[in-house]
Amino acid sequence: MDLTAHAEEFNADPYPFYEALRAAGPVHRLVLGGERAWLVVGHEEAREALNHPALSKNWLGSELIEVTQVPAVATNMLDTDPPHHTRLRRLVAREFTARRVESLRPRVQQITDGLLDAMEALPGRRADLIASFAVPLPMTVICELLGVPNLDRARFRYWSGEIVAPLDGAGADPRVLEEMTAYLFELVAAKAQEPGEDLLSALIRTRDEDGDQLSPDELIGMAFLLLVAGHETTVNLIGNGVRALLAHPGQLAALRADPDGLIGGAVEEMLRYDGPVQHATYRFADTDLELGGVSIPTGSSVMVALAAADRDPARFTAPGLPGPEVFDIRRTGQGHLAFGHGIHHCLGAPLARLEGRIAIRSLLERFPGLAEDPEAGPRDWLPGTLMRGVTRLPLCW
C-alpha cells in the first residue's frame, strides 16, 4: 500500500487504514513519502520496536534521510543511540526535572487565563482555537522556559511548522534548518555570556559528577528538540482533545460535572484515542531482525504507528469495557504509547500533561456553551503522517 496515494483521505481519518492493516498483521511493508519502509501497527510489536536495541535512531546512517547539512540539529536525544543518548538524557534530566515542571503550574494557568480573556473579548463569540489558544499557550510556555525573547517567538512557530510538516518529519527545507540553527547558535552564545534562570542557561551550566557537560552543538540540538517537540505535541493534544470532547457530548458533560476527578484520565484518553503524534520518527535496522513474525533485513527503515497501536483491540479490549474505537474518559489501565516507550520516551511528557489538563479544564470552565462553529466549513488537516491534528478549529460559545 502507498499511503501517500491516499493522502487526503488518510489525513482526515487514518484509523480505517490502520484497522485494515492490523487485521492483516502487525507489521507491513509499504510506501511512505515515496520511500519503502516497514510500518508497525500492533501495540505489542510497537512497544518492542520502540525499545529494540537493533533499531537505531541515527538518521545520519541512513540513505533514506538526507538531513543534515546542519549537524547540530541531529545532536539531540531523539536522533541518537546509547551510549551517546544515555549521556545526553542524563545531562538534560538533571535540569528538566519534575520539580521544575511543577513550578511552572501558576505561570501556565496565568498564560491560559490571559489567552482565554482575549478569546472571550473577540467579536461574535467566535474564535479559532488553534490560532487563539492551542498554539500560543505551549509556545509561550516553552519559550519562557528556555529564555527565548518574546519578539523571536513568531519565527519559532514558523520554523517549527516547516520542520514537522513533511511526511517523515525529517525532510524539512535545509534553509529552515540553517536559519533556526544559526539563531540558536546566537542564543546559546548570549546565554553563555549572560545566563538567566531559564532552562537553556541551566543546561549550559550543568555538569555531572565527572565534570561532563553539553557541547555547543549538543546545546543547539537540545534547544532545537525542546522548542519543536516542546510545543507541537501540546498544540495537537489541545486541538484533538477538544474535538473529541465536542464529538462526544456525554463525555463532555461528565467532565464538566467532575473536572477534579476526571481531567487527568480525560487527558490520557485524548492522548490514546487521537493522539498528537501519529507516527514515531524513523528507526533503522542495524541487523536482520524479526518483528511480529516478519523478517526485517539490515538497513531497512521502520516507522511505528503510535496512533494505530493505541487502537489495537489486542491491547484495549476487555470483557465489560469499551473497545479501543470508543472515546471513554473513565477508561482505566491506559498503557498508551502517545509519548513513546523505552529509552526514547518523551522527556517532556509531564509538561505536556500539565499544559493539557490546565488548558482543557480552563477552556471548558470559561465557555459553558462551547461548540464547533457550524459555519466553519471543512476541516484542514496537518499534512504528512508525523503529527495528527487540524490547522484550524473554529469554535463558538
Please tell me what each predicted stretch does.
Residues 1-397:
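Cytochrome P450
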